[in-house]
Amino acid sequence: MNLNTKYHGNIEYEEKDVIYFPKGIPGFEELKRFIIFPVEDNEVFLVFHSIENEDIGIIITSPFNIEKDYEIQLEEEQITNLKIQDEKDALVLNTVTLSSDIDKITVNLRAPIIINIKEKIGEQIIINSDRYKVKHPLFKEEA
């Protein structure tokens, strides 16, 4: 199958690549089916793209690229909804807000996207803690 994206050109994918989000994601609750693909020539960023709306693609990254000790605790309901039986089946990703000013690029560590890679089910959750920021700087200033 083909997806003609606004910013990344034509992307080929198979049905097995599609991740289902029963609740959609905040701001796009009506969109339920997404694929993930790498940003060309970049090992840190991925694209989280709707296959239902060719204009909706979000840059994402692993939180462990930013915070080595990143840790979340899923609630029982979330574990059940995502059908997670082993933590190895859970992939954690976070959305990135881009800017032409590199110092203003941020990562939302408070609302991770959790994906059961075995079942191809996902959900964006909101962490009820001040430990992580919604706008965490991607690049910290060196002291």
Curated annotation (Swiss-Prot):
Keywords: Bacterial flagellum biogenesis, Chaperone, Cytoplasm, Translation regulation. GO terms for cellular component: cytoplasm. InterPro entries: Flagellar_assembly_factor_FliW, Flagellar_assmbl_FliW_dom_sf. The keyword Magnesium does not apply. Pfam families: FliW (PF02623). It is found in: Cytoplasm. Signal peptide: none annotated. Its main location: cytoplasm. GO terms for biological process: bacterial-type flagellum assembly; regulation of translation. Belongs to the FliW family. Acts as an anti-CsrA protein, binds CsrA and prevents it from repressing translation of its target genes, one of which is flagellin. Binds to flagellin and participates in the assembly of the flagellum. PANTHER family: FLAGELLAR ASSEMBLY FACTOR FLIW. Interacts with translational regulator CsrA and flagellin(s). This is Flagellar assembly factor FliW. It comes from Clostridium botulinum (strain Langeland / NCTC 10281 / Type F).
